[in-house]
Amino acid sequence: MQRHAYICDAVRTPFGRYGGALSGVRADDLGAVPLAALMARHPGVDWQAVSDVIFGCANQAGEDNRNVARMSALLAGLPLEVPGATVNRLCGSGLDALGTAARAIKSGEAGLMIAGGVESMSRAPFVMPKAESAFSRSNAIYDTTIGWRFVNKLMKAQYGVDSMPETAENVAVEYKIEREAQDRMALSSQLKAVAAQKAGHLAREIVGVSIPQKKGDAILVDQDEHPRETSLEALA
């Protein structure tokens, strides 16, 4: 008989803007924050019983490149015996981590899992490939913030290598989604997010991130930076 999988608790850090308040925080340190908060919130849990920590991460080009799930688990203070694995399904990475954890529990392979994801586009590095020949004078540099890098020419010729924003534009053209309709949807989403934030609906799930300052006390970032007041005129 297949077992059921349940979400027992959920915590996260605030969503930060590109180059915003969280831009100075490494991805592995950021991933450790909710893990440490989860442990503090449930002191009665035997954390050695955790079968695995599964994190999704799409970039993996910089400070998040060496199995960031394991790095975050160690930094958070989870027992050394608890393993970690990082999955990459690009924008669906975090949700894929959740699915992987649920399947492990339902199959009987695991009893207690931690699943989530971490990303820092602000700290995505510029990268350079090695020269293909000795004393080569050619060079290339890739911004790993979003989209492809080290493009396979055969892949590009066969499928294209558009980034997610470019794909969104292509889909809008193909399905004749007018800009005004997109703006109305965006405005509705923003207004709901702002209302939820003001009402305090997100407070329980958010763990504040302490940002050290060169002078004075550290700043606690405990609200999403993304939701903001806007209008159809501003979006047009």
Go through each PLM region and give its residues.
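Fold-independent oxyanion-binding glycine-rich loops
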Residues: D9-V11, C57-A58, A76, G116-V118, ...
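Flexible glycine-/small-residue-enriched beta->alpha junction loops
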Residues: G111-V171
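Acidic, glycine-rich active-site loops and adjacent beta-strand->loop/helix elements
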Residues: V11-P14, G56-Q60, R89-S93, G117-S122, ...
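Active-site-proximal alpha-helical scaffold in enzymes
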Residues: V87-E119, A172-H201
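Conserved active-site "lid/cap" helical segment
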Residues: M1-R70, A76, P83, T167-R179, ...
